[in-house]
């Protein structure tokens, strides 16, 4: 048998998209490998812990609490499925997200090639590399180096999933010159509906798909109407696990999640800044905020509420403020618009700073540079390349979804791939205009670039915003018992914003952990002066009073804490102990019974109940 000669491997035979995927995945895996050797792989607090804890509850068989979802459920159930197959290991979902993020880079390359393809009679800078592919490659490289994408692709957050699906749908629209089949439209609707159970802003792409049906693709009116109906039906079908659970298991008319009401209030209230500044009565952190929002609504209404009623309560507060202050609302929208494009990074969970400080992710691009280049590129492309308007519309629709609530670094991340395409186009066109001596066009672009740079660089004057990263970094150091780093970070946060209740509370926790009880009390009282509803400060002051055997004072602090957090089982337990030591056995029995009713998993609750039952009135 005659053997064929071996063919040497040539790199140029490997598609660019494959090389891109492998290169970006390697960068993300570098960050993930560093993450596995750090304290940040297993979340202990914040939004990441919220999802991780929810997934673990599902694994234990707590599929539902028979109430409407109060938090979008998809990511928690997805984590639970991964944990069920692979065990409780955050590495696996992070690896999948790294793959998706590499896929986003490939989508950028393909979008660039499709949208910015060299038109007839137009010459590219390189005969061997058409304009569209160069722009797509530049945008993909920008995405690989974009620092927030590096961070959010490897932690337990659903952001990478949204970004990939968002731009996959845009690519499906842009790459087609003819209307897709009804079956394809149905699948796209299902995909958007399913993804909305994780991040609801994907639904702002539905109008883009419907617009493509009527404006981009030709077809009979009846077929267009049928396609629109199928897309909408697909969205409802994709989201059906959420609304079926809410309507038929919880018997509560909620489409996806009832927490949309409190988000609307946080974004539209008298003290709103366009960022998630929590009004009095609500505390930072997803889990704490959700609990506070239910407790505050029920206290205001004087009765237990369904989740839909909680959502309606907060939505009506926001709408009432908007009706009463239309001028302030318009100014707030302008502030949100400015915040969306600002170079200032409001990373509400401070993951980017933490990962960068620990050298887990590489130094890279920030939003400010991308926005400064992307805005003039968007204007030029909108003018010269009609196909790019679909990409621009996707960016603007995503921005519109945030104007209804508030802006954070992770929320605006889905707009970055589109801005990178426009930034790459702008740089490409600037170089081409300079090389071909089209100085007028180059000058116009540079003038727009100067204006966009000035716009995105407008300073943030609120010192509390500058305190966010140092505050969150201080909390992370405190949880890791790195008290010297925690002190340095929290003191800097306090210097930025001494009148912030949460920073005062964190300072109290730091001084308590380091044994300075007097300073801890001072900061807890400072937190209560700034926020009289701060249940955590009341609780910790009660614990200190217990340790000092000042039983009546401890009881008073715990009762105040329960006014604002009535379903906290630990506080009921501590109040029962204070009442027992004060000799109020009847109250002690009532409080420990309530603690056990709320959370029967704690053996110390039953031990205290037994101690109360065996205590005679004259023994105290």
Label every model-predicted segment:
Residues 92, 320-391:
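Membrane-interface anchor segments at the N-terminal boundary of transmembrane helices
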Residues 34-52, 65-78, 87-91, 253-258, ...:
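Extracytoplasmic catalytic/substrate-binding loops of multi-pass membrane glycan-assembly enzymes
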Residues 43, 70, 74-75, 92-103, ...:
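Multi-pass, polyprenyl lipid-linked donor-dependent membrane glycosyltransferases
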Residues 255-336:
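Membrane-proximal stem/loop segments at transmembrane-domain junctions that anchor or position
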Residues 129, 134-137, 172-193, 222-229, ...:
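Short hydrophobic alpha-helices at membrane interfaces in multi-pass membrane enzymes
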Residues 95-122, 168, 172, 372-376:
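Transmembrane-helix motifs of polytopic, lipid-linked glycan transferases
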Residues 1-33, 113, 223-234:
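Start-transfer (signal-anchor) and selected internal transmembrane alpha helices
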Residues 19-20, 108-145, 163-164, 183, ...:
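Transmembrane-helix signature of polytopic, membrane-embedded enzymes
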